[in-house]
């Protein structure tokens, strides 16, 4: 399945990383909406209905964990694919979000934009 035109919501408070990810995703033909905090991200997830969400864990207003719990508790957003971007590589942090049904977990210090974009494309192509 083609990924061009698929909608990705990028929720990340680090402006540099947000812009770098956005540019890389747009180069692959994806429609990218961005949010700089968890509250805005949750609002956009509900109104824009993205095909996939890239979600930072530590953000102002609402944490990524709070956003993820709200997404999974809402019938309209329950099934959306979510990839986590986090500074934490602690197993308990990974397990906590994994139990909420994520499609992947990336540690920012090891982040490769190529690898991230490849994973996003893979997940979006897998949609039926």
What role is predicted for each listed range?
Residues 12:
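Conserved acidic carboxylate
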Residues 59:
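Receiver (REC) domain active-site loop signature in two-component systems and cognate sites
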